[in-house]
Amino acid sequence: TGLLLPKNHKGKVPSSYGSLGGTFKARLSENTLKAGTLMPKIPTVSSGDGRLIPQTFTGVHINSQEIENLTANIGRLGRMKQRNSTNDAPILLNGFSGNQGKRKNKSTRSNPTETSKFDFAGVNYNWGDTGLSTGYNFANFDGAYKQHIVNGVYTLAIDDSQSLKADLRYAKTSEDAKSGIDNKAISSML
């Protein structure tokens, strides 16, 4: 499942297990550049942190909040480290490649479920005191899919400490190469 500690060739869990990653961070005005080990939390890619060692990615991420009420993100991820591994590897679609559920070690154009180029970009606009924010996000998993996500979030303040939040999203994912990934999804949350 990619969630548990790895086992060695004897079926035993290693006696030590750890991971270390560094990130360069620079800030100019309301713009932030991060390069190195990243744990993104954006609509098109989200690092899993529900286990002892979190999933991490290696890449570059630029976040800009230079324009009032507008947040922009752009970046490229090239490698990933699963929660049950201490090794960087090509980014895998769902942690496994193909329908067989077997990990593949080589990244090739004929294996569209692995990539070293995951590009993302997105903007989110907060419409002032209206409680409404809208966003658009794009991702390109090189050789597998392109994804567009449009969302709207409305927050209704009930009192100073409570609010009701509605989130509506539409995602369209289209096949790139022969990945077999092609879908549309609508989701909502209250």
List the predicted regions and their residue ranges:
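Extracytoplasmic loops and strand-loop junctions of Gram-negative outer membrane beta-barrel proteins
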Residues: 4-8, 42-44, 103-107, 134-135
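Catalytic micro-motifs at enzyme active sites that drive phosphoryl/nucleotidyl and oxygen chemistry
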Residues: 11, 21, 46-49, 59-61
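A short, flexible beta-alpha/helix-coil linker loop
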Residues: 40-42, 173
